[in-house]
């Protein structure tokens, strides 16, 4: 059966509206899910371990006697790594090493060190940078088991110097994924609990008798997990609420069309709502990509998901030239942006908004997903206009440092008291003036 993908032309009169229709996505809030999540959060907050145990046994069809029994010992993570097929273990270890190397470099470059300077009057100003004390990592279980996500979330936290990393992962019917457990070991996870869903998010946010409360929760999950993360934000920090995965390919028509087709598939196979778009100035090349899609789709194990994604949210777009493609890309602000062209750096300089930029025909998005090194946790749904990939900087916090000298107390006090009186805050003004007087008396003495 032929696949039907939208084909747009940027020179057509209705192009802007057509593109908006392709991009339109708004995460719907299911009232039933919202009510269920609110109840679970309240229950875990009130009953702690007992509630977590009840929900876990019910939803994952387990018969655990306690939450403590749901914690995995480090020896089980070690056994999972040892039990991997050698080639797969080597791949996982290589990916972990590359991700760690990139984030160690990022730590040096991203302003992760405290700093200060001294003014002429002896006043010291600066900033103290400290890692978070404890971070929670949510990892999906069941069919959607992604060891790469464990590495991408755990390693930057560990490189940042987070005190403790607590991972939660559901194990429906008691089934554990050895790749996920091995990734937890390689990523430096300290504790692993086999719990999931909104109850796991609640346990991490509020703490229970067994599960420690964390300062920030990271990691992907289903609609219940996303709703729970949204609701606990403020009690704890969160990484982001991710939407469907996206790829935008800018191609000048010089890449093998089957490569481009497979790159579009690489996001479409995630789920039916994932989005894959091609922008190209060469109409004949677009037709060749369309032909490659038709030929390659039947060979894909997840062809039904890919078809639904491409037909529902995909597009092949003819643009005037690569410069226009860059302008459109900046408006879309995609999660993943591939520039598959002879001169990728020329066009890359024009990109301002993208979660990750993949330069050149040999740089497939999938390499970034697994092992290139940069983080694959990226902003979606146009949030790349103001958001960044997950990184070591997400696991630091900054405190301002102020140490005022006696002379500085007089200089700054005059400014502060004047502004405080202007705002009608007399105690603020007096607080500054007392120190002005105290500093003056000390200097006289």
Swiss-Prot record:
Substrate binds at residues 245, 267, 270, 336, 369, 423, 428. Pfam families: Histidinol_dh. It is an enzyme of class 1 (oxidoreductase). Its cofactor is Zn(2+). The keyword Metal-binding applies. The active site is at 335 (proton acceptor), 336 (proton acceptor). CDD domains: Histidinol_dh. GO terms for biological process: L-histidine biosynthetic process. Its EC number is 1.1.1.23. Zn(2+) binds at residues 267, 270, 369, 428. SUPFAM superfamilies: ALDH-like. NCBIfam families: hisD. HAMAP family: HisD. Belongs to the histidinol dehydrogenase family. Catalyzes the sequential NAD-dependent oxidations of L-histidinol to L-histidinaldehyde and then to L-histidine. This is Histidinol dehydrogenase. It comes from Burkholderia pseudomallei (strain K96243). The lineage of its organism: Bacteria, Pseudomonadati, Pseudomonadota, Betaproteobacteria, Burkholderiales.
